[in-house]
Amino acid sequence: MFDPFGDFATEGYLRNFDKEKDLEIVKIAEHELFRAQLPAALDFLAKRKQIEYADFLEVHRILFEGLYPWAGKDRAEVLPNSAVKKGALYFCHPRDCRLAVSEGWSVAHDKKLLDKRPGFIMGMFAYGHPFLDGNGRTMLLVHAELCFRTNMSVNWMRTSKQPYLDALTKEIQAPNDGHLDAYLKPFIAPQIPRDNWLQSVSDLPGLDGIDAESDVSAGYSDPAITKEYQEFERRRGYQLDNKRAH
């Protein structure tokens, strides 16, 4: 059980307002909240002249503030000294959440690149992993809006959950190799109206992203964790550009 706060026994899964410990119930609540708040989140994105990191956080808040007290707050604010990993895969250090997402913006805001590198963008969002839960839904909505503004879309209904998640995992591990770009290429399609997106998005495969409940949290104060994280970053072989944070 993912318990980064260390208080699951008294506060439930990720300190949800009901202190619910049954993960199946929590996930149902997440999904129903997402469906209910989806129009508001998409409307918010549609009105933004240029989407930035603060808007990424706001989408998460809109979707999940009815369930989690930390909704809309990233790991740098909530748990700045804790690593989040899944097996041998590490998400970025909390201090780099903004940098990682902004690295995705650097491609997303270039209309000549977005249709060629949609997987790179999604991979950077996933590596940034700003939130303790709800990353998959949040980044999917932001990614869809970015695609819309470039007169394109990803036909997510034609994708399959496990192959997508496998490609996403490889993308996080090796962002220079184009794993997710290659996976998504056959699914690139013309722009679709936002209303059509609204009707279908709640049932997309892989909506949760890489399942948060299987995450593990550990303090960077543990030398073994720090060493393992540094080794993962070395193998990953990608340097974030701190000039791009916005």
Give the positions of each predicted feature:
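FIC/Doc superfamily catalytic core
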Residues: 1-133, 137-246
